[in-house]
Structure formats: C-alpha cells, structure tokens
Amino acid sequence: MHILLVADGRSPITRRWVRAVVALQHQVTLVSTFPCSAVDGVSALHVMPVAFAGMGGSQVGVAGAPSPGRSRQLVSRFRSVFLSARYYLGPLSLLFFARRFRRLIAEVKPDLVHALRIPFEGMLASQTPASIPIAVTIWGNDLTYHALGSPWMKALTLMTLRRANGLLADAHRDIRLGQLWGFAAERPALVVPGGAGIDLGEMHRLRAQFVESFADLLPAGVPMVVNPRGFRPGSVRNDVFFQAIPLVLERKPKVFFVCTGMAGQPEALRWVQELKLEGHIRLLPFLPQPQLWDLFVRANIFVSVSAHDGTPNSFLEGIACGCFPVVGDIESLREWVTPGGNGFLVEPHKPQALADALVVALDNPDLLSNAAEKNLQLIRQRAEAGMVRAQIEIFYQRLAGSGAASLTTTP
C-alpha cells in the first residue's frame, strides 16, 4: 500500500510512525508541514509550510534540524502572540497550498492519506479528492484548544472531521469528542499511542549504545524531578510547575528539577530568576531520544501539568523507564493513572496541589517502586510497539479496502 503522510517531519513522533508503517511493508511519501532534514524510510519528502511553519511555530526537537534563526527566536519570545496570529492567518495559507497538494496527490497516486494531527495537517489533507480515503489523528489539544482559536479554525476543524474516513487518537476521550465535532460514529476509529507504541527492547538497546554522560550536568545522589514537555501555550501549565518548585524546596531542599526543551527560553529563564531557583534546576535543550530515556531512568518523578492534552508520548516513555507520573487531572490521563496507585493526578492550575503531590511521592519510595512495576505492565498490555503496529495494519487495510466513496459523508 502507498500511504501519503501529512505531518511535521521534524518530530520524533512522525519519524517513529514512519518506521512503524515501513515495517509493515508499506511505501511512504511524506508531506512535511515544517522544513526538516531527511527522514529515513520515506520514498519521497515534500515540504509544504502551511500556516507560516517555516518560522518555527511549534516546538519539537530532532537531531539535524536547522538551528533557530532570528525569526524563531522572536517566536520563542512572543509565542502566545504568534500562536494567536496563526489562528487567523494560518487558514488563509491553506488556500495557497491546497492546489499544490492536490497536484501532488494526482502525481503520486496514494492508496491512503493520513494526517498526523488536525491543525494544520488534517486541514491540508482534507483537500484530498473524494476517491481517496483519508485518516486523521487527533492530538490532545486539537479539539479542546486549537479548534476554538478562531471562527476559521472551528470551521476547518469541522470540515476535516466530516471529510475523514477514519480517525485515530491516543485517548478514547478524543474519539468521543471527534464524533461530537462531526466525525461519523459508524466509521473506523482506533485508539493507539501517537508514536506507534513503545518498543522496550529498542529503548534498552539505544540507551546502552548512547555514550554521552549527564555526569557534568546533573548532581548525583539526590531526588530528581523531570519535566520534559517544553513550552506548549494553552496546553501545559509550566507557570504552575515553576511556582510549585519553591513550595517543594521548603520541605525537600535537596530535590533537583530538570526541564528539557527549555534551554535559553526567555520564559523559563525569567521564572528561574524571579523564584531564585538557581542551583536547584537545570534547563536542558531538546534531547535525542536515547538521552531522554536515560534521563527518565535516572529521575524519580515525571511531571506534566497539562490542562489540554491527550496521552503524551513522553508520559508513556517516562513510565516505561520507571518514572512516577504526577500529571494534570484531565480526562485523557485518567485513562492511565489511578491516583495513589500508579501515579498522582493534580489540578493543573494549583501550584500547592502539585507541590503536595511531589512531596508525598518523594516521601514514599515503596509507592514509587510498586508504581514502576504496575506502569511497566500497563505499557506491555496497552502500548507495546508490535501490538500497536498490528492494530495500525488492520485499520489501514479496512480504510483502503472499503473505498472512500462508501466511507465519505457530504458535509
């Protein structure tokens, strides 16, 4: 089968999905909505920077990506303003790229088009001719946050979900929300991790091969809390995370905090200075996957204070490596976390609640140990890569075999 993926080619999630699809013996053409380096496994790579993606409007880290230029530094400083502008100007850019996308479809003749999120990849993919089925993956904040960004975002989200022949998400909540937004309930839907599953063997093997050390960056022999989420406006409440740190240090002065994707970020530097956190925190850049996994193994606790989210791949990787999760109390993460059993859920707007949960976890090593065993079993039961690939294959074959005409409803 020839599958045309529409995704951010810089993203580790995209690259893992490509590897999974290629492992299923399918041909992959990638349309990247961001400029990116070569992607292993694809037969062809085309870049269509919709919504001014060339300026770097989202955060991902991948080896070989272009270094941030002045425009990306400005985006970092004025991230919220830039995001708001994209909600109004981004949809207009689709008018320019739609014709180019349809020409590419006519040229490569894929059997199936799959967009790895709704804005703006799914919106572009919705321009696929009706004779070709399309699958759309929902990310956790696509419907609860981005779709409400402007009237144009709402209209294009509705159009995308009505056009979609199949829907994927990493949480059952998002399939339900997708149906409320116009996806037909009788069409195929699949809940699987967005990164095509967790390969425990690969994680162990690549960690063993990775030679770079944290010895000069992080203190040894102290409790460690890791926040790997970077800055995601409107989704992750890093303001709450930083405000909780002094509250933890009052009771646990030896705890050390590590944040990836925050090195040099003005917002992070401002919080560190204002809250006098120097010596208690390390702001790291985005890390290669093996190094991130090694950090998870070294850390005691994984923190993600999400207000809008699905099931973050970093969450699955963190619990697979033994981290105890302390995460926002949102519906998608309730599908994974039993409070006091294998993690804690906290109100995402309350620094004191987060601090209390961190202190309780750090005071209970048996809780952390038992949770690590439970979470590893959860990964094996619900997110193991081989099992997920088999589910993806069945889903793709069902879409391609049914024919788009029988699956498409006129908006």
Please place each PLM-identified region on the residue numbering.
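Glycosyltransferase donor-sugar binding loop
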Residues: 36, 228-231, 256-269
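Short hydrophobic beta-strand element within catalytic cores of glycosyltransferases
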Residues: 324-327
